Amino acid sequence: MPNTHKITPQEALLRTIEHREIFHDEMLHIMRGIMTGEWSPVMMAALITGLRVKKETIGEITAAAQVMREFSTKVNVADTSHLVDIVGTGGDGSHTFNISTCAMFVAAAAGARVSKHGGRSVSSKSGSADVMESLGVNINLSPEAIAQCIEQVGVGFMFAPNHHPAMKNVAPVRKELGIKTIFNLLGPLTNPAGAPNILMGVFHPDLVGIQVRALQRLGAEHAVVVYGKDGMDEVSLGATTLVGELKHGEITEYEIHPEDFGMVMASNRALKVETPEQSKTMLQGVLDNAAGAPKDIVILNAGVALYAANVVPTMSAGIDKARVAIESGAARAKLAQLVSMSQQLKGAAK
């Protein structure tokens, strides 16, 4: 095949209009141009809208994620065994409290090491960074300090803008467009600590198969990609969840149901919040072992994360461990440890 990677913005845009794929090397070239600010905001907006209309392919997503990783500020964790990210693409419009943020403390208390990669609210009522800050966690630590948190506490939070400085060129365009774009798919694929394991929630059923295959191409070890049929980008308590799993290089797709794990189904209405403050209150309630749907959905998601992190051999075993982590107070203690350590390391902030 000829060397086609030098593609102009206009050629790339035409390709999306004609519903034709942009090849891997071309996508690398395009993304590098976007990251270095070579592309004008108009062409950037046109291309990412065109990709969305055409529907991004696994190859396009993989190439774009490779470039984002290339330009990112890394967190070097010495031992990545049992290291997992618990993350959603967001944009599911469900306005629930920060389930994955809460689940990370539970998973860490039960033996996983969690490198959580998140940002402020884009489409939800409360982004993971918003709620972490309100809990007292210092979200602006240096990469070295975050690695220390992961190694010593078992959990670290990476505030996305600090690790993807090149994204500043795209941020205003994304904000003004106000639609989901390829960048919603890329954030969860670009963990700065290089977590080899991941529990990823997606906002559309088609993305289960797409994202798990992108993760396979990007070299992930154990990935569990989920979509709740009630529209949630989490393992759902109110519906069947579609799962795409990558393990030992093989992909399997299947469905799970809360009742498979002895859980009582509940509508996600009980999980809705309006403000980061409400999200914080609900999250603290879960860690304080308050019974109800919020606790159950966190147990479900933390349990699946423990399975993704290879701490347990089955999702059921993970769910049992997650329940103990909450009921023993270990998950609550994990939050306190992260708050304390992140504040102590403030001197190491950016």
From Swiss-Prot:
> For binding Mg(2+) 1, which residues are annotated in this chain's numbering?
100, 234
Which cofactors does the annotated protein need, by name?
A: Mg(2+)
- Alphabetical list of InterPro entries matching this protein: Anthranilate_Pribosyl_Tfrase, Glycosyl_Trfase_fam3, Glycosyl_Trfase_fam3_N_dom, Glycosyl_Trfase_fam3_N_dom_sf, Nuc_phospho_transferase
User: Does Transferase count among this protein's keywords?
Assistant: yes
Protein residues bound to 5-phospho-alpha-D-ribose 1-diphosphate:
88, 91-92, 96, 98-101, 116-124, 128
EC number per UniProt: 2.4.2.18
Biological process (GO) annotations? L-tryptophan biosynthetic process
Residues bound to anthranilate 1 are 88
Which residues of the sequence carry a binding annotation for Mg(2+) 2? 233-234
- Summary of subunit composition and partner proteins: Homodimer.
Protein name per its UniProtKB record? Anthranilate phosphoribosyltransferase
Per the UniProt record, the source organism is Albidiferax ferrireducens (strain ATCC BAA-621 / DSM 15236 / T118)
User: Which lineage ranks, top first, belong to the organism behind this chain?
Assistant: Bacteria, Pseudomonadati, Pseudomonadota, Betaproteobacteria, Burkholderiales
